């Protein structure tokens, strides 16, 4: 069976997108029983697959879309800001048209995506209304990080769990090691600079590991 994939990235966060409305051997994918978890693991693996941080399943029509996200390790994810923008670009490509506002239903609820600018045939600038940020309790196994109690830490939800830790030197932190200690959250480390009004951030994504975004 030949399934068409498109490969996208948002800020270096890479995703494969499958339009489940496509017809293969006379039947649309959405009507088939396909093990998408196994497909995500195989396709996202850089050794033998295309390599990506996750697999996005697209459904819907026109400016109304639905998104299902499966991480590279096969685990589900409720939401991704970069992922949803990649999904919308794939939807535009499938429809051969663009819409100024797109409604995307995710496992974290409805998200609104706005087309800011069409840069060229391969690039778009899209903004996402991510919804309210709400506080979360300290995640399970947080003590494994052995954080200094004076270090600034926030546990937050944007539909999926994030923990943000302020550090002095972002390059001195072994983020891969820390992320593997708390694999059920998205772990971000931040430090001031390089400009006075900027911060630098690195991310260890739940189910995906270190990403470029």
Residue ranges and their predicted role:
Residues 142-174:
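Internal active-site segments that recognize and position negatively charged phosphoryl groups
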